Structure formats: structure tokens, C-alpha cells
Amino acid sequence: ERIEPSNNSLFGMVVVRTALRRFPTAQRAFDRQGGIDIDRLQESALFPGTPVAILHASRDKKWYFVQAENYAAWVSAEAVGWAPRDMVMAYATRQPRRYITGSQVRTVFHPYAKQVSELTLDMGSSFPARTDWPLSEPVNGQGSLGSWIIELPLRLDNGILHFKPALLPRSADTAPAPLPASQANLIRQSFKFLGERY
């Protein structure tokens, strides 16, 4: 892959949970033949709503090398919608927000808005809360009385970032603000992952 001496960075936002890869490939590598645990090419993951700088694209344009707030690696291009930096940062800092406090929660099922239907959202993620939405106005054709209305990032077919309202059940483990940084909360949140595979 040819990398230019200087590069005009694009900006974007992760729209689905995506793997951070050491190289631009989904191929896996293990310490021994027949291994199935600890893929050595898997670095970490990024969650929907994470702003990124797009620093480089693979030759086939299927992968982006991105810089997130805390990590730099390759991600699938289909997992990122690109937009001007101001638009990306405005979404990332917009208030009020809804914070995911369960290990994972899912948006409400919607047969006609598949991009925001049953989307998995992970602990630590937060999304703009649409507290200004009139209760009498449906969200994607569905009433919102039993749900929080949040705004989710989407990737259009041409790769451009777009935002769409979605419903998050009020029964889901979420909060209107970050949890206080206390030992009790750290332990309580940690136990929400008990029994999950690493």
C-alpha cells in the first residue's frame, strides 16, 4: 500500500460495532495451528457513535486506517460514515445524552427501519437524547411512550454519515448521565459482564 508523505484527513463516525485490526484483513492468525482463541490480528473494537479521523484507505477501499480517541488501527470501511469534522464533533458532544450502563442493550425492533432495528449498543457508549421529540409524533412509524428516543449514526450507500432517530426501551439498562466514579459502581458494572466469553 502506498502512503503519501502528507495526507488530508477525512473524519467519520463508527455506525456499527467494529473490530480494530492490525492489518486491513478479516483473516485471523493464532499462535498455533488449529487455534481458535486470541486472534493476534485483533487489536480492539470501536462502538457506534465513536468519532474517528480517517487517515488512509486500503487499495481496494474496503478498509480505513483510523485514529480514535484512544487507538489507531484498521476498520472495515462499511462500519464508518464520513462527514465534515464539525458535523462529527457536534454529534459526539451534543447534550443531553443517554448512557448505556448495561453490558449490552438493543434498540427496539422495527421491520421498516432495519439500520436502527435491534442494534446492539455496548456499555460506555452514549447517544444524543431527543428530549425535544413530541410524544404524539411517531418515531419511524412507532409510538415512543415506552422508550427513550436517541439519535443514531448511519452510513448511507455512498459512505456519507447520516443520523436517524431510534427507540431504546425504557426497561434497558441506561442512565441520563455518566455513573459516578466510585468503587461500588466499578464493581457493580464489572459484575454485569460475569460469565461472558472474553
Q: Could you say what each language-model-derived stretch is?
A:
Residues 10-11, 44, 56-57, 118-119:
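A general structural signal for short secondary-structure junctions and capping/turn motifs
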Residues 36-72:
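A conserved hydrophobic secondary-structure block that centers on an alpha-helix together
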Residues 1-21, 25-37, 67-115, 123, ...:
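Boundary regions of SH3-family modules and the immediately adjacent low-complexity/disordered segments
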Residues 47-52, 121-130:
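Loop/turn positions that initiate beta-strands
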Residues 190-198:
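Active-site nucleophile-His-acid catalytic modules used for acyl/amide transfer and hydrolysis
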